Every structure is written in structure tokens, then in C-alpha cells.
Curated annotation (Swiss-Prot):
Pfam families with a match to the protein in the record: Ribosomal_S13
SUPFAM superfamilies reported for this sequence: S13-like H2TH domain
Name the UniProt record assigns to this protein: Small ribosomal subunit protein uS13
GO BP annotations, alphabetical order: translation
Function: Located at the top of the head of the 30S subunit, it contacts several helices of the 16S rRNA. In the 70S ribosome it contacts the 23S rRNA (bridge B1a) and protein L5 of the 50S subunit (bridge B1b), connecting the 2 subunits; these bridges are implicated in subunit movement. Contacts the tRNAs in the A and P-sites.
Gene behind the chain: rpsM
Keywords: Ribonucleoprotein, Ribosomal protein, RNA-binding, rRNA-binding, tRNA-binding
Organism: Campylobacter curvus (strain 525.92)
Family indicated by similarity: Belongs to the universal ribosomal protein uS13 family.
PANTHER family per the UniProt record, alphabetical: 30S RIBOSOMAL PROTEIN S13/40S RIBOSOMAL PROTEIN S18 (PTHR10871), SMALL RIBOSOMAL SUBUNIT PROTEIN US13M (PTHR10871:SF1)
GO cellular component, one term: small ribosomal subunit
GO MF term set: rRNA binding; structural constituent of ribosome; tRNA binding
Biased composition (Basic residues): 95-116
Region (Disordered): 95-122
Subunit composition and interactions: Part of the 30S ribosomal subunit. Forms a loose heterodimer with protein S19. Forms two bridges to the 50S subunit in the 70S ribosome.
Length: 122
């Protein structure tokens, strides 16, 4: 099992799909990395030599932001929006949808479980 960017990649998968298990790498970026490292997409993870794995690690480390660094950057970007007091920042702070969705009936994922209002018993 190859370990790249702190993630164990599944052995039986093709390397182009195996790399997508790393946070911040999708199929397009995976193919870019493999092209830069000169590795075939058809190769399976367990078929990688140590040199090829090192080439992938080097490419990711030098040219891509992944895993913890990317999570930290996203969190910092959201915090900056909140500190600015922008509309998007306020929506993040209140735990409501940020991208203009209606909230009268839906948005349960973002708002959480329903809070019943006005159903008091005598």
C-alpha cells in the first residue's frame, strides 16, 4: 500500500483513481500529476516502484496544496469572510446556506434538526 501525502492509497485501484483519495486531488489534477511524473494512468497502485512513488510525492509537494494545508487554507478563507463582515461571512456565522438558496422550507443540512415553535401544551 503506497503512502502519499499522509494517505494510504488502495492497492487494487488504478493510480489515477487512487490519487483521488487525497483531499484536494480530483481526477483532473491526478492526471496532471501523473503526466508531470511520467507515469501511465493504467498502472495499479501496488505496481508502483519506489522511484515512481517518490516522483509523485515530489510533484505533489512542489506544485499542489493538499490535505491539512488545504483544509487550513479553506478554514482561513472562511474566517476572513466572517471577519470582514461580508454577506457570505454572516451566512457562515449563522450556519445558513451561503450561495443564495431559499431557506423558508428547506436547507435542513445547513440548519440542522427542526426546532418546533409554537406547539406549547396547556
Amino acid at each position: 500500500m503506497a503512502r502519499i501525502a499522509g494517505v494510504d492509497l488502495p492497492n487494487k485501484k488504478r493510480i489515477e483513481y487512487g490519487l483521488t483519495y487525497i483531499y484536494g486531488i480530483g481526477l483532473y489534477k491526478s492526471r496532471q500529476i501523473l503526466d508531470a511524473a511520467g507515469i501511465s494512468y493504467d498502472k495499479r497502485v501496488f505496481e508502483l516502484s519506489e522511484d515512481e512513488a517518490a516522483a509523485i510525492r515530489k510533484e505533489i509537494q512542489e506544485h499542489h496544496i493538499v490535505e491539512g494545508d488545504l483544509r487550513k487554507q479553506v478554514a482561513m478563507d472562511i474566517k476572513a469572510l466572517m471577519d470582514l463582515g461580508s454577506y457570505r461571512g454572516l451566512r457562515h456565522r449563522k450556519g445558513l446556506p451561503v450561495r443564495g438558496q431559499k431557506t423558508k422550507t428547506n436547507a435542513r443540512t445547513r440548519k440542522g434538526r427542526r426546532k418546533t415553535v409554537g406547539a406549547a401544551t396547556k
